[in-house]
Amino acid sequence: MLLSELSHPNQLHGLTVSQLEEIACQIRERHLQVVSTSGGHLGPGLGVVELTLALYQTLDLDFDKVVWDVGHQGYPHKLITGRFSQFDSLRQQNGVAGYLKRSESKFDHFGAGHASTSISAALGMAIARDRKGDNYKCVAVIGDGALTGGMALEAINHAGHLPNTPLVVVLNDNDMSISPPVGALSSYLNKVRVSPPLQFLSDSVQESVKNIPLIGKDIPEELKNIKGSVRRLSVPKVGAVFEELGFTYMGPIDGHDIGNLVKTFNAAHKLKRPVLVHVVTTKGKGYPYAEADQVGYHAQSAFDLTTGKSIPSKKPKPVSYSKIFGQTLLKICEQDSKVVGITAAMATGTGLDILQKNIPDQYIDVGIAEQHAVTLAAGMSCDGLKPVVAIYSTFLQRAFDQLIHDVGIQNLPVSFVLDRAGIVGADGPTHQGQYDISYMRSIPNFVLMAPKDESELQRMLITSINHNGPTALRIPRGSGLGVAIMDEGWEPLNIGEAEIIEGGEDILIIAYGSMVASAIETAKILKNMNINACIVNARFVKPLDKNLIMPLASRIQKVVTMEEGTLIGGFGSAIVELFNDNEINIPVYRIGIPDVLVDHASPDQSKEKLGLMPDQMADNIVKKFKLVN
């Protein structure tokens, strides 16, 4: 059978191992062809091809439920669930999403873009199944990196106390999340992974299997058939941690051996209780460059399949904000040993990899554990260190309570750098950094800022570190504007001080962060209509520079705010509140992201759809204030 002929995963039923292996080759070929052309997540999907095929041969996907953690691993799933012909549109506007999405396919049982959610969701489905009296299977597939997340461990703790609730958790152990995994759990899994087999399953498990009505007597023989691949240690006991938590542990087994995977999954389903199947895979399997550099090929822009090298853009791009942040923080750390960079499994993405390589003693990776990262930083600041926590805007949402309870209330000097703030593009609604202005603005004691360019980023970083209280600095995804930066001697900003970029008396545009550049372009278009705009770079959303903004607004009487974030509770709302609190009755036109989810597309396509391109904003400003007769 050809992969292109698969329209339903149940068509895998009855296929031989050799037929499944042929489909596996076709999946990798299609996966590589599409990602090399348009970009996307490469290594994770290549590593779970055999796992996916084997698992789906043991399930009826019209009834059974599978929850894939994060969705990085979901490309093979998409290719065998009716999206082969549309796969060229991966991560493109109106195309196939890069993550699982319930609205896209009935086989996407649960959507996810953030890690560590799968076991909770699958357990919830299992509990609902049992209460309804149904009998479908529920499976969670989670990577070893995601298993470091507290939510996953909370779910394991809960599921283990439900011994009569059938649930299969497949641990896809490739010893790699996005960055190399960290922590004691990772070290434990590594010991399990390399340990020799001493005993196959415990006598108690075999005995419990025998006691299953009708089918119990047949299972031990089936289990014996997979003795070579499903292993369990006696001393030290492999899987002891999971078994103490109430799971039956099976593994570790070869995640690329389809025959043994099928037998193992069938055995796991028959146990009718919480089972953890430990599958060892190779991230990037089948593509030598991805196997050799599992971090670099986790996700890729378009690249040459033959050489494995990225296809350079036609025009050289300025250095990214993330890299400039990392380079600047490294310089600061070299001058001050009390400054420590903290990341949650995103060293490369946040630019902290340069700190990790050069001054590892001033670098901490906590794994996929944002809540822990925030409170860890709070504790460090209590005893004189100066923590700088670099986390994507979308992931910091996961630690909102810690931001309030552990940092804000205690007014601790922790610096947060929110990477990927604003519209991020192809990763879609789970990754858009559109909420941080709103959720951070409500926390007392925090100072919030966003730079207009790379140089201002450097000044804001030193301002944050020097400030005796909590700060949050948001930076956008992608390249900077190409302005000159300094290697040292950055001048701190005065907290809450804005600047006038351009004078004008017809309209006042107050822009925040990345939207300052767009405001300048918008003003140029307005100028061609003989409309002169005054442009203010707010720099800070909290505190606002009321001494600058209110007199300008009172004089010009027409105000526009621009932000790359949700309008609800955002920067524009802060301006409206400022005017209202000071009894200034001035019309304000807020431009930003309305109350919608921003789907996957290129950043410019998303901005155009939202009306955030300069020509659109200029046109809407003119219409709003009737500036042209």
From Swiss-Prot:
Mg(2+) binds at residues 144, 174. It is an enzyme of class 2 (transferase). Its EC number is 2.2.1.7. Thiamine diphosphate binds at residues 72, 113-115, 145-146, 174, 287, 370. Pathway: Metabolic intermediate biosynthesis; 1-deoxy-D-xylulose 5-phosphate biosynthesis; 1-deoxy-D-xylulose 5-phosphate from D-glyceraldehyde 3-phosphate and pyruvate: step 1/1. GO terms for molecular function: 1-deoxy-D-xylulose-5-phosphate synthase activity; magnesium ion binding; thiamine pyrophosphate binding. InterPro entries: Dxylulose-5-P_synthase, THDP-binding, Transketo_C/PFOR_II, Transketolase-like_Pyr-bd, Transketolase_BS, Transketolase_C, Transketolase_CS. Its cofactor is Mg(2+); thiamine diphosphate. CDD domains: TPP_DXS, TPP_PYR_DXS_TK_like. It catalyses: D-glyceraldehyde 3-phosphate + pyruvate + H(+) = 1-deoxy-D-xylulose 5-phosphate + CO2. One of its GO terms (biological process) is terpenoid biosynthetic process. Keywords: Isoprene biosynthesis, Magnesium, Metal-binding, Thiamine biosynthesis, Thiamine pyrophosphate, Transferase. GO terms for cellular component: cytosol. The keyword Magnesium applies. Binds 1 Mg(2+) ion per subunit. Binds 1 thiamine pyrophosphate per subunit. Pfam families: DXP_synthase_N, Transket_pyr, Transketolase_C. Catalyzes the acyloin condensation reaction between C atoms 2 and 3 of pyruvate and glyceraldehyde 3-phosphate to yield 1-deoxy-D-xylulose-5-phosphate (DXP). Homodimer. Belongs to the transketolase family. DXPS subfamily. NCBIfam families: dxs (TIGR00204), PRK05444.2-2 (NF003933). This is 1-deoxy-D-xylulose-5-phosphate synthase.
